[in-house]
Amino acid sequence: MGSLSTILRHPDELYPLLKLKLAITKAQKQIPLEPHLAFCYSILHKVSKSFSLVIQQLGTELRNAVCVFYLILRALDTVEDDTSVPVEIKVPILIAFHRHIYDGDWHFSCGTKEYKLLMDQFHHVSAAFLKLEKGYQEAIEDITKRMGAGMAKFICKEVETIDDYDEYCHYAAGLVGLGLSKIFIASELEILTPDWKQISNSTGLFLQKTNIIKDYLEDINERPKSRMFWPREIWGKYVDKLEDFKNEEKATKAVQCLNEMVTNALNHVEDCLKSLASLRDPAIFQSCAIPQIVAIGTLALCYNNVQVFRGVVRLRRGLIAKVIDRTKTMDDVYGAFYDFSCMLQTKVDNNDPNAMKTLNRLETIKKFCKENGGLHKRKSYVNDETQSKAIFVVMFVLLLAIVVVYLKANQCK
């Protein structure tokens, strides 16, 4: 649930953590009895506990469609990510993946751990897919076809320019945003806005760029071959080879490049907020809003942080629990983006080559949040110091009281 020392430093996160633990337990008990769907929800919980949780509030039909959609794209991503699979085998599979989802006998063994289980037992996902309504099937097939073709293209092509970077992120995640929008429309719970394609694509790019940034070390250490998604147009300003950022003597250059990558990702924030504001169904809204808030929080944590090149950088579980607990309305979203933008702003070094660009971007985001949200109506996600101290005092007093009662009881004996 979280280490005791972390909870003591952030006692305001204890209650959300307990609620999250109960919600996860409840979700695990709600796995459908039907074998194919039972496998889908069970493996979804293994590959992404957070996504498994945030879709629980969706209606059954829509939840099943989103679950199957996620697993199909996760399987596609597993094929792409497995660098041990020869290119001549991998590319045809990616291109034909949209046809494999209709084949109940198809599977391809690759990946590791839970991802290998997903691939080995893919017939369960295919069977669940074939039971979805036609509108869901068509949306999922279309996105799978386009994503597979895009991934195949970048198996044989390096990410050289920022345009390449945006194109790759479109194939890897922008299409996920478009696909979810199509699924929501098919459910008749949402309607299209005139700019739905652009803003849906941006939500995917924002999430994908965040993952590419935080996963630098994991991707560069991939064997037998590194995965490299940072665009040469950015990293080439700082080093000769992308893997050089692992070297301690390149720490300053590494952090400067990291900061430019974060600043690039921030370009998508306004579209993300517009996309969330367009959603009408509360459950759909919450399932889409939580990952976006976690992304801006992750960027704030990664910015100017050399640890990205040394190990794992991720938000505290307690902070994620707080985000899940507090995200109910657009005011909450605007507040979260405002708070994390302020947090990121305090980390900007004026000597950084992109400092001015970063600060301007953050001011624009904060202004957008102020103009569109009631920031005074919500609790802060990152600045609850007074409340935290009060909770800490209460916890300390309660703990002391328990110890005193225990000691007195022993004395009586």
UniProtKB/Swiss-Prot annotation:
Topology within the bilayer: Multi-pass membrane protein
Cofactor: Mg(2+); Mn(2+)
Protein location: Endoplasmic reticulum membrane
Signal sequence, renumbered to the chain: none
GO biological process per UniProt: farnesyl diphosphate metabolic process; sterol biosynthetic process
Expressed in which tissues: Mostly expressed in hypocotyls, leaves and cotyledons, and, to a lower extent, in stems.
Chief location bin: endoplasmic reticulum
UniProt modified residues of type N-acetylglycine: G2
Assigned keywords, A-Z: Acetylation, Endoplasmic reticulum, Magnesium, Manganese, Membrane, Transmembrane, Transmembrane helix
Transmembrane segments: 283-303, 390-410
Gene Ontology CC: endoplasmic reticulum membrane
Cited InterPro entries: Isoprenoid_synthase_dom_sf, Squ/phyt_synthse, Squal_synth-like, Trans_IPPS_euk-type, Trans_IPPS_HH
Family classification: Belongs to the phytoene/squalene synthase family.
NCBIfam families xrefs: squal_synth
Name of the protein: Inactive squalene synthase 2
Gene expressing this chain: SQS2
